[in-house]
Structure formats: C-alpha cells, structure tokens
Curated annotation (Swiss-Prot):
Residues 19-216 form the Lon N-terminal domain. Homohexamer. Organized in a ring with a central cavity. The lineage of its organism: Bacteria, Pseudomonadati, Myxococcota, Polyangia, Polyangiales. GO terms for molecular function: ATP binding; ATP hydrolysis activity; ATP-dependent peptidase activity; sequence-specific DNA binding; serine-type endopeptidase activity. Its EC number is 3.4.21.53. This is Lon protease 2. Keywords: ATP-binding, Cytoplasm, Hydrolase, Nucleotide-binding, Protease, Serine protease, Stress response. It comes from Sorangium cellulosum (strain So ce56). It holds the Pfam family Lon_lid.
C-alpha cells in the first residue's frame, strides 16, 4: 500500500494561485498517496514535457466525470481535485510517459483560464482540519479496526501491511490512505470522488467506514463460501454481495459473459410477452440456469429451451388486409380459374371485417398434381398480407415431426409446426401442410393422429408441443392442407377440415395459363425476351394438344422450358436469332407428337369401348377390349383388375347373357364360346365400379358385331337389374374426355348435380347424356354392324335393343 510522508500534510504554498491541470480518468488521486500514472494524451504530454527539469513541480490532478472523453474541457472534470508533486518522470516511448505523483492536499477550482497548450486553472487550497474530539477519535478507531479485519481476511498481503495503519494518526489522513488503495471493483470513481469532496473529516471517515464495511462483508461471505458454512443470510444485502462475488469470480475465470447472456435472454422473453402460465415456467428455468456451471450439459439444454421460448411469436401478429376487392384482385393475378377456392377466401375476408376475433379457417385442397394447390397458399398469404410457410409432410412417419421430441432426448427440438411459426415470426401465418395424404405409420406413431389436435379449432388454442411442454395458441393460424386423393387421409382428419376440390384445368385454362404465366416465366428464367423468342397462339396450342396430357400444368411448363432452352443455346453461341414458336418450330424442337388421337383407330372394331376413370393425377380415358374364342362359356379377365372391377366385369357379362333373347343371341352359342375382357396397361392396377357401363357396352358390341362409336365415352356402375348407379369424379372424367377429343359422354342420371362444377366451355363442347338404365345405352353408343357375326342381331334388329 503506497504511502506518503505524514509531515507532508502541510504542503508549501505555490508561488501563484494557478497550477497546470492534469486530467485523470478511471481513478482518483488522494492526499497521502504516491501513484504512477501513464500519460499519452496530447495536452497531458505537453504538460509533462513542460515540467521536465523542474524540481518539486506541482500539478493539479482532477478526475474526469466520464472516461470516454479523450480531450476533456473543464465541464467534463470534477471541481475538486488534489495538488500533487511530480516525483519522477519516465519516458516510455514517443509521446508516452509514466509520471509518479505524490498527493499533497485538496483544492477547488476557482476559475479556468487556459486549455492550450495544456489546461491551467486558478485554485483554492482546502486546508485540512486538525481539530480532534471524542467522536472523531471513535470514528478513526472504528475505521482502523475494520480495516485491520479486512486485511486479516486477505492472506496474500505482506505481514507488515497492517503496521502502516499505526503510522497514520490523523483520522482524515487515514481515511484518504484507505480510500486511495481501495480496489476499483468495490469503489467506483464516483464513490471515491465523493470521499475526496468530503472536506468535513467526520463525514469523510463515515463514508470510508461504510465502504470498508461493505468490503468486510464481502470477505466474510467469501470465507463462508470457501468453508461451505451454510448460514442463513440477510436476503437483500447478502444476495447482492453474492452476486457481486460471483460476477467477480466469473470474470476472473473468463466466464463473465454468462450473466449478460442470461440477462439478455430474460429481456428477450420479456419482450416476447409470454402468457402468465409460460412466464412462471420461464422464471423457474432462468433461476436454474443461473445456478448451473456453463460446462454442464444441462446448461446448454436449458439455455436452448429458453431461447426457443424467446423466439416463438407468442403475441406478434400481422394485420390482415381485409379489403374484399384487394383480396380478389391478388388471387386473380396469381391464378386463372379456381373460382370455388377464391370464393371461400373472399368469404373469410368479408367475415373478418365483421368479426375480428374469427378463428383461422382450416381448408383441405384435393386435386391432381400440378393444378396449383401449394402455390395457392402463397397467393392467399399475399392477398391477406400474412406470412407464408410450408411444411412438407410427404413420407413423414414419426409423430414427433409434428409434436416434437421430449427434452429428455439428446438433440431434442420442437415439431415442425412450432419451427414454422418461429420462422414466420408471427402467430397468424398461412401454414401449408403439403401432401397430407402421403404420411405413413410405423412403430414411432401416426403423424396423422398428431394433426388431429393441430387442425381442431376447438383444441388448437392450447396446442402442446412435447419439447416446450407449454400451451401455444394456434387458433389464429390459417391452415391449408393439400392432397392428391382421399385414400391416404384418415376420416377423423378429413372431418376437421373444409374440403375444397381443385380440379384439373381445361384446354382453355391451360392455354390462358401458358400465355399469361408460363411463357413469361420461362422466358425470364432462360434470359430471353419476346424479341428473341415469340410464342404464337397456334404454337402454344400445339404444345398443349400434342405434348402434354395431364390435369395440371407442370408438364406443360417443362415443354415450354424445352423450347426456350433450344433458343437459349443458339443465343449463347453468339447467333443473332429471332425465333417464332409456331407448331412447326415446336415439333422441330420437341420431336414427334407424344400424344395422338387414338380414339378412332382403337374403336373401329367391335368389342372396344371407351371408358372414363378417376386417378389421383386427374381424370383419364381407358379402353376396355373384349374378344371371343371357342370354349365353354368361361370369362377371362386381364389387365391388372382388382376385385371391385372384376365383379363389375362379371356383372356385365351376366347381364348380357340374361338378356340373350332380347339381344337375339343364341344362348347355346354363348355356351360354346369363352369371353376375354382386357384393359390395356398391365402395369397399372385398376379398380372401382365405374367401368361397369363400359364393360357392358364392350361385351355387347363384340357379341352383336357392332362397333362402339369412336366419339363416345361412358362411366357408371351397373347392377344385375339393369340400373345405372352414380359414381364419383364426374368433373375430372369430363375434363379428361374433353382433353381426349371426346364429343359425347354418357353419365348416370343421378350425377346430374355434379355438372354444376364442370366449366361451361366443357359443357358447351361435349354432349352429355344422362342414363338411368342399361336399356338406354346400346342405341346411343353402337354403330351399325360392319358385319353380322354368327348368331348376332341383324342391323334391323338393333333398333329393337332399346327395350333390352
């Protein structure tokens, strides 16, 4: 502990009442102290260089109010400082000195009259009061005793340190000596400056005694901690002391940032405005985190858990765009057609204008691939001003993908629902659950069952992820699920959603989509402009008619991209080209037509009928072929037919045999032949009852020798009583017939209501006939026989078949 000569308490008077001023930052110089300081600021360097060679030079040392000011003015300095003698000056380098100062006495600045070349001021010396009384003696003795006790609890100090206290008899000087040597961690510059400005000796001793008392308490607590003595402490004072001690220890260990991180984490959670129930858990976890060692695995687990809570949008929402016209306009800009979907979103926007507390809808879009189900979600989000996130569920087999893993597992994380909400940053985004029909089930659980709570409006306001184990409100999320077919979706899950069927596009729709969306998109993607490649209307029609046959437009976009690539190659080779995508140019680039009209050529012979089928990819046409051979009346079924379709074929053959007399067929002849019913494309499984009408027409055509008209297709389930019963997928089947060039379609009469969903341009171009019994079918579909087979009806007799 550096000290000065006690006799120097009465310094010699300067020649004048002005002294040069040396600003000091981050410390305070007291009388009775000898300290070295580093000088490197320009003004201070000039002052020191001016004092070189002078003996017993005096300077006024004043502390800065803020250490951040590099060249302070008098306003940035305290008004009270210490007159010091320059004991020694050591040059450390260019413009850098170490100056040893001996504090002599206090002074107050009377006036400042110079800043350059260094600061200088007129000062008033503050004389030290040497009057002693009983109270001052008692205060001095108490300070001396408390300081000895502090020194006794610091075993690393030299043994004679306590003896220095006995050499200083004046209480005021003792207070200055102790204050000057107090560690900065326990006494700030402001605290020490307050002691320096305490001209009254009693007040000064009391301030230092309080400071020593706090340090004494710190050392006592440290001793208690080291000896593991568990005693009850005063909560307020002891907790503060412990935290200060812990902070100092962590700083020494290089772990001082943990408390800052925990405090920052607490502040982030506070800003997230978590519910009261969550806040209670958070407080408990933060308390546990503070007591953990940073190196422990549990520390990182708990910290990650709290960071997830802080990052989730507990209260943050986006403001919906509720203008019906704006929503409708955004949807029309992004998608052609799909009126039913647009109508539902517009209805929701209208209701939100009237009821702001309306929960988000839960919609299920079912339709073939490529019709825009997923992109609809993005368009809906844009139209409503909401964030958009997509969760791909195809192939998901683990329930934890939805509800998360419990924190007991290594590497546990929340499920995809909360991950998507964290990424969105709001609690009311548009969340697309893509391909919900393609989730699987295994020993790890059923993700579809986990979605039951997510998609239930009555339950999802308290959705509980396994990782968080806290309720989270999903009621404001707009859930949009997509699927290709019903088969992979459990009934209870479908029951929780509003189903909207998204059909395939008509030829007119595809032409419009290609013209308005796909062609500009692909030209831009390939770095082309209309000047380099121009798509004509006939060229687009050629791509649609001859190179794609699908419900959606993905294949159409790929073919347009192929045409663009061919031009892009020529441009990249340096050719100055300007091409026009005519039908001839399209064929030159894409090759021979991939889809040809095969209706006429395949239905010119008896025994071939055109049917309509529904698939997850949309509607399709299929051909049912029948032939006969000598035999014993057996029926052979091929073409990868499943049970229901096989039963339909058996029903059709049985009905024809039962009506042999009405069809003018010899029953004995039917016993002498075998029938073979076949559906091409063996590799594709086929099932369903809707091909019954087509099988009946094919078998009757074969036996009567009359071909089925090439422009007619049909669908419908049959019964042994000759009734034609309703089927599903009528809209998709009619769209498939329209794509294939069919101009006449027979459907069950009970499917009349399904025609409301069929686009008007399709109904205008296709003749749709309703049939309710098999008696009506043959006159509508059979051509006159090209040759009358043995034992078959004559051409004149075909007119009588309406009474079958």
């Amino acid at each position: 502990m550096p000290t000065g000569d006690p006799s120097s308490r009465t310094p010699p008077s300067p020649d004048a009442d002005s002294v040069p001023i040396l600003p000091l930052r981050n410390s305070v110089l007291f009388p009775m102290s000898v300290v070295p300081i580093n000088v490197g600021r320009p003004r201070s360097v000039r002052l020191v260089e001016d004092l070189l060679g002078r003996e017993r030079a005096l300077v006024g040392v004043i502390s800065q109010r803020s250490p951040d000011v590099d060249e302070p003015t008098f306003k940035e300095l305290y008004s009270v400082g210490t007159v010091a003698r320059v004991v020694k000056v050591i040059r450390l380098g260019p413009n850098n000195y170490s100056v040893v100062l001996n504090g002599l006495g206090r002074f107050r600045v009377k006036s400042a009259f110079s800043l350059e070349p260094y600061m200088r001021a007129r000062i008033e010396r503050i004389p030290e009061s040497l009057v002693r009384d009983v109270e001052l003696e008692a205060l001095g003795a108490g300070l001396r005793e408390a300081t000895r006790e502090v020194l006794g609890l610091m075993p690393n100090l030299p043994r004679d340190t306590a003896g220095i206290l006995d050499n200083v008899r004046e209480p005021g000087a003792l207070a200055d000596l102790i204050a000057s040597n107090f560690p900065q961690a326990q006494a700030s510059v402001g605290d020490k400056q307050e002691i320096l400005e305490a001209f009254d000796v009693k007040a000064r001793v009391r301030l230092v005694l309080a400071m020593v008392g706090r340090q004494l308490e710190v050392l006592r607590v440290k001793k208690e901690i080291s000896s593991m003595v568990q005693e009850e402490m005063g909560k307020s004072q002891r907790e503060y002391i412990l935290r200060q001690q812990m902070k100092s220890i962590k700083e020494e260990l290089g772990e001082g940032g943990d408390d800052d991180e925990i405090e920052e984490l607490r502040e982030r959670i506070r800003r997230a405005k978590v519910p009261a129930e969550v806040d209670k858990v958070v407080r408990k976890q933060l308390s546990r985190l503070r007591s953990m060692a940073q190196q422990s695995a549990e520390f990182n687990v708990t910290k990650t858990y709290l960071e997830w809570i802080a990052d989730l949008p507990w209260s943050k929402t986006t403001v919906d765009k509720l203008s019906v016209e704006s929503v409708r306009r955004c949807l029309d800009e992004d998608h052609l057609g799909l009126e039913k979907v647009k109508k539902r979103i517009v209805e929701y926007s209208a209701i939100r204008q009237l009821r702001t507390d309306k929960k988000g809808p839960i919609l299920l879009f079912i339709g073939p691939p490529g019709v825009g189900k997923t992109s609809l979600g993005k368009s809906i989000a844009r139209s409503m001003g909401r964030r958009y996130e997509r969760i791909a569920l195809g192939g998901v087999r683990d329930e934890a993908e939805i509800r998360g893993h419990r924190r007991t597992y290594v590497g546990a994380l929340p499920g995809r629902i909360l991950q998507a909400l964290k990424k969105a940053g709001t609690k009311n985004p548009v969340l697309v659950l893509d391909e919900v029909d393609k989730m699987g089930v295994d020993l790890r659980g059923d993700p579809a069952a986990a979605l039951l709570e997510v998609l239930d409006p009555e339950q999802n306001s308290t959705f509980q992820d396994h990782y968080l184990d806290l309720p989270f409100d999903l009621s404001q999320v707009m859930f949009l699920a997509t699927a290709n077919n019903w088969d992979g979706i459990p009934g209870p899950l479908v029951d929780r959603m509003e189903v909207i069927e998204v059909p395939g596009y008509t030829r007119t729709d595809k032409l419009g989509i290609a013209r308005e969306f796909l062609v500009p998109k692909q030209l831009s993607a390939h770095g082309l402009t209309d000047e380099r490649l121009e798509f004509t209307e006939p060229g687009i029609e050629a791509v649609v008619d001859h190179y794609t046959r699908e419900a959606g437009v993905r294949g159409l976009e790929r073919q347009i991209a192929a045409v663009c690539r061919a031009t892009a190659v020529k441009v990249a080779e340096g050719n100055d080209v300007r091409e026009v995508a005519t039908p001839e140019h399209v064929e030159q680039v894409l090759g021979p037509h991939k889809h040809r009209p095969e209706i006429a050529e395949r239905t010119l012979q008896p025994g071939v009928a055109t049917g309509l089928a529904w698939t997850p990819a949309g509607g399709e046409i299929l051909f049912i072929e029948a032939t006969k051979m000598p035999g014993k009346g057996n029926v052979v079924l091929t073409g990868n037919m499943r049970n229901v379709m096989q039963e339909s074929a058996s029903t059709a053959v049985s009905f024809v045999r039962s009506k042999a007399d009405r069809l003018h067929l010899d029953p004995e002849w039917l016993k002498e032949i075998d029938l073979h019913v076949h559906i091409p494309q063996h590799g594709t499984p086929k099932d369903g009852p809707s091909a019954g009408v087509t099988m009946f027409a094919a078998v009757a055509s074969l036996l009567l020798g009359a071909p089925v008209r090439s422009d007619v297709a049909m669908t419908g389930e049959i019964s042994l009583r000759g009734r034609v019963m309703p089927v599903g997928g009528v809209k998709e089947k009619l769209l498939a017939a329209h794509r294939a060039g069919i101009r006449h379609v027979l459907i069950p009469a009970k499917n009349r209501r399904d025609l409301e969903d069929v686009p008007q341009d399709v109904k205008d171009q296709i003749k749709i006939t309703m049939v309710s019994s098999m008696e009506e079918i043959l006159p509508l579909v059979l051509e006159p026989p090209r040759r009358a087979p043995a034992q078959s009806a004559s051409p004149e007799e075909l007119e009588e078949q309406a009474g079958v």
